Structures are given as C-alpha cells and as structure tokens.
Amino acid sequence: MIGNDRWVTEIETGPVTEARPDTNAREPGDRTPAAPPAATPAATTDQLPEDRYLNRELSWLEFNARVLALAADDSMPLLERAKFLAVFASNLDEFYMVRVAGLKRRDQMGLSALSADGLTPREQLGRIGEQTQHIASRHARVFRDSVLPALGEEGIYVVTWADLDQAEREQLSTYFHEQVFPVLTPLAVDPAHPFPFVSGLSLNLAVTVRQPEDGGQHFARVKVPDNVDRFVELGGTDTDGAEGAAVHRFLPLEELIAAFLPVLFPGMEIVEHHAFRITRNADFEVEEDRDEDLLQALERELARRRFGSPVRLEVADDMTEGMLELLLRELDVHPGDVIEVPGLLDLSSLWQIYGLDRPALKDRTFVPATHPAFAERETPKSIFATLREGDVLVHHPYYSFSTSVQRFIEQAAADPNVLAIKQTLYRTSGDSPIVRALIDAAEAGKQVVALVEVKARFDEQANIRWARALEQAGVHVAYGIVGLKTHCKTALVVRREGPVIRRYCHIGTGNYNSKTARLYEDVGLLTAAPDIGADLTDLFNSLTGYSRKLSYRNLLVAPHGIRAGIIERVEREVAAHLEHGPQAGKGHIRLKMNALVDEQVTDALYRASQVGVRIEVVVRGICALRPGAEGFSENITARSILGRFLEHSRILHFRAIDEFWIGSADMMHRNLDRRVEVMAQVKDPRLTAQLDDLFESALDPATRCWELGPDGQWTASPQEGRTVRDHQVSLMERHRSP
C-alpha cells in the first residue's frame, strides 16, 4: 500500500514566482519526433517568448487531477481506487495549508510581485479557487457514483442512518452512549459563549437549535472527534460478500452524532445540522537566530501552527445560505474560499476502508528482491567487501532497502573496525532501524554524527524526538546551516583496514526510511570510490562546522553548485551536438524528477531545443516548462508516470557528453537556493546501463502515462486501442523475488 503520511508530493514553500495560466482546451500531447527539426540560430533569454512558463500552482492541481484519474480508473483494484481518493484529499489539504496560504499572505501584505507567467497573487488565488471547486466536486462524485457502488458489490457498504433497521440503530445507540458521547463537547454561541475556536482539518457539525418556549434559535458547534474511527462498523457481519468474503457495513461518525443530537441538546428542537471543515495556514517560517536554540524556536512555531488563519472552508452542498453566512462571518472566511462538496467531507479517512483485509481488492503483494551483489550465500556477505569489488546501484522498491542501505548502516554499527558513521536524516520512520543502528554505534564507542533536519515540514515533532534520543545516546547531532534545510541523502562510513583508512558512501534520491522505501521509487549509489569519500568528508565538515566549501570533485552541491552545474552540462551537450552536426542528432538530454519549475534551468533547456537537442522529461508532479511549443520547445517532450509506487528518483542523462547524475534535488527554487542538496555522477558503465534501461522503460511509447501539451494540459497516453505497458509492473516482474 501507499503510506498515508506523505504519498504523492512535497509542497514547495517560499517565493511564489513561477507560472502561466491554464486553459480550457485539451489537446493530445505530441510524441517525440523521430528526427529533430533542423537547427535554428541559438537564442538568448531575451529571444524566448514571455509566455514560455506554465503556472506552477495550476500545474500542481493538474497533478492532483491525475491522482484522481487513478481513483476513477475502474481497471484498478477497488481498494486501491479508494486509497487514491484518500491521497487526493490529503494532497489538497497540504496544498491549501502551504501554497494557498503563502499566496494569501502575499496578497494581504500588498506584495505585487508577479509569478513567472505574469499573474498577481490574487489572480492566482481566483484561478485556484475555480479549478479546485471543479476537481473537488469530481472527487466527491467519483466516490459517490463509482467507488461507493463498487464497494457495495463487494460487500463493503458505507450507509446512512436512514438505511439502518431498528436492530442496527439500537446497536449504534449503545455504541454512541458508551464510546462517543463521553468525548463530545457541544459548544453554544450566545452572549456568554463566544464562537469557539475551530482547529484546522477538524470535521465539525454546525447545528441550529430552537427553544420550545419562545422559538428563539441558537447556533452550536459539535466537533467530530478525531480519536474515534471515522467510519463506525456495524457488528453482526456475515459472509455474503463477493466470493464468501465478510460483509462490512460502516456509518460515518458524523451521521451517528447527528442522529443523537437531541441527546446533546435535551429539551431543544434540532432545526438543522450540516458538516463543515476548515483548513488553516500552516506555512510558517522559523526565525533562526545563531544565539537561540533551534529546537526551542521550532517548538514555539509549531505551537502557533494550529492557530493559523483560515484558508479554506469545506461545506456540504446542502448547507443553507443562512448557516453558510454565519460560518463565513464568524470564521472570517472569504466567500471565494468556500468549497461546496456533494457528499462526505474529508475522504482522507478512506484509509480506514483501505485497511480492510481484502487482498483480492488490492494490488498483488510485492516483496522486493535482495540486490544480487548483497545476496547471502553460505555465509553472510560483508557489504564492505562487496563495495571494494565495485560500486552498486540499488533501485528501490524493486531492490530491498532493508538488505542494502539499511544493512550497510547496521553492519557499520556492529563492525569493530568502523571508526565513524556520518549521516543525514530528513524524514525517517517512527521505529527507524537506521536510528537504532546509529544509537547502537554510539553506545559501542564509535564516532557518530547525525545531521537531523528538524524543519522537515509536518515531520518536525518526530524529528525533534529522534534528535533528542540520538543526543542522549551520545550521537553528535547537528542541525545544518542556518537558513538552509538539509535535504541531501548521504551517509559516510569510515573503516580501518589494516594500515589503511577507507571510506564507504551512500548517496541516494530518497529518505532513510524503511517504510516509505517500500512505497517510493528511488535510486541510490553505494561506493568506496575515494573521490566521493573525500567529497562527503568535506560536505559533512561543512554541515557540522564552519567550512564553506563551494566546489567538489565528483558532486554537485546546492545551494551553490547544482543549478550552475546543470546549466553548464546542458551547454556542453549543445556544444557536442553542434560539433557532430545537428543532423547527426547526437544531442539528447533525459531528465527524471518530481518537479521542474526553475526558470534558469528551463530556459537552458529551451535554448538547447532551439538548436536541435532532443529533450525528454519524465516529471511526476509540477512542470512549468511548455513542451512542443513552436519556436522554442519543438524538441522537448514531457510525460508523467503515476501508479502503485511514488516516482521519486531524480536522474539526469546527457548523452552526447556521456554523463549520468543522481541525487536529491528537483529543479525548484527551494531545492536549488534554500536547501543543501547533493547530485552525484554515476560513472561505472554497469550502473549507467541500469539507469539507461530505466529511462528506456519510462520513455517507451507504449508506457502508460500522461503527456503534457504546450497549452499546459495533460493527456492520457497511449491513445485508446493501442498496446499499453505499465512501467512499474514491468520493473516488478523483472525484480520479483522467487
């Protein structure tokens, strides 16, 4: 399954300076031409059109619409469709908490800086509101009209109070009085009771009650508790479901509470009740002061997060006008921030339904294979001995994280010849074996350094806990460089081998998280190459001390080196292409990433396209680049692959200059300017062949994907009736454990 903590994307914060408005027309994306057009004179940025960027906010909404398309796809296993409905909802929550909140702050402050496509914050907010209302309504309809009936056919029902018979109502009455009623707190609003604070993302009932004596009406709010299952399962299930499976009947918790409102308001007449949900601004910045403890500053800001200003109000579409006006007034919400939903609010709760033990309704179980280089034979093989023989590239989740990267750290912790372990930690699992190994290593007397990024959004509290646990065990914990997030995925092991000190390294695209490593697609390089070991030594010295090294032997490091390094390689690719003659078609750039937004990198790609370099982009989420546009991007194609696993790796290939790079950085402002990121060159021909195979599979014309047109619209590909292959399924079959 896909974890419900952070599935599909990370939301960028900071300057909102990218974009181009969306349009209504949808046209199929063009295929990569067999032969590029003839070369045209090289262009400067001034010669590129002003409308060359797509709007990054609307592009993100298009991405979430692709997630919704998976939920609407009846060829998907049914509970996987329910999962994608939950993913869509969680994604949209975070988008409003961060991106929309940032735009609202800029609008309220009167900041008039335009996005890259020339829109003001207010104009972007207007377009976001329109597009969100459309896709949120479609989201609700997919659940109500497609997934919900299909669940019923499989013996899984989400019912209303009106659907229940008397015996079921009596059963739920007992449950309500014993399990729910004690945790409810009805809050009245009158001169003695001000309007209550409504916490972000909480589900609530807005209730109007009438006094029988004088007919006076009053408002009250009832919070639906979030520590009780959202879907209350009725007991007494049988096995009349599909193929003898158990029947499950669920009642939404808010329906149960609504049925017993007279118990909460005895002696009052219930006039009306409606569900609503508010989203609050969670886009805060920690003011880092060299004289203040970062953890204390962060904890102070986390306490403020729950009190952020409202950025969205979700209501059932049957809410009365009077009730809506009251909520708008009391919650201080702009009418343009209201999303009317035709059905249940907060479908992120569908993770509960996904958790049912119905394997026939889910993806087939996949067990990652152990990489052949690390496969145990008669005796367990030392990872250090393996790396002395040559570099290893691991592709997760197809190759196991636990028997490669995790084992690398665990063996280092247990090896008496290991002198030091240094590692960056951005997001890790709650019961992290990586953190446990670091603690064991420190307790065994090794020098252990952990660079813990406590500012990883929405994981701050967990990272603070781990940082303190590591410190208590004797680990040297550092928090990086003031003003920068440390996002790179690097580990360095220093080992004594006779008279020699040897360094072993891991550089990856994904977090050191054994749980998400089963769900996220990532690549990692394990190596004993001396130049990379020397580079990582310099990098950790920079992160933990006062070193400010800007250049490295075999790495590109942000915020100073990645953008310039990539643009330099694009320009070298152009030079090699022109040297061999444009008709030879030698220039060819392939990029795989989560997001492509940065204007300088995008312009470099446009200029390469104009001289005939072929450029293929595989981007999971946001893409501000306009492919296939006449005059500047005819030789660029862009596609997006979504599926069972979250495509998370960042891989760059420059064919004419024969360079492959992997790393943690997407082409976004936050990654290139406000984070410590690392990209490493992969040189071993055995490993570059593996990366080449990955690109060939992702870019196969028959691969199931969406293709981006110059108008900013994504079109499903291949077209109906053509042969279709699934990139991820193909890789699973290739790597499936026996």
Curated annotation (Swiss-Prot):
Cofactor: Mg(2+)
Designated name of the protein: Polyphosphate kinase
Record keyword Phosphoprotein present: yes
Active site annotation, chain numbering: H487
EC number: 2.7.4.1
Source organism of this protein record: Mycobacterium ulcerans (strain Agy99)
Biological process, per Gene Ontology: polyphosphate biosynthetic process
Comp. bias (Basic and acidic residues): 19-30
GO cellular component, one term: polyphosphate kinase complex
Stated role: Catalyzes the reversible transfer of the terminal phosphate of ATP to form a long-chain polyphosphate (polyP).
Gene, per the UniProt record: ppk
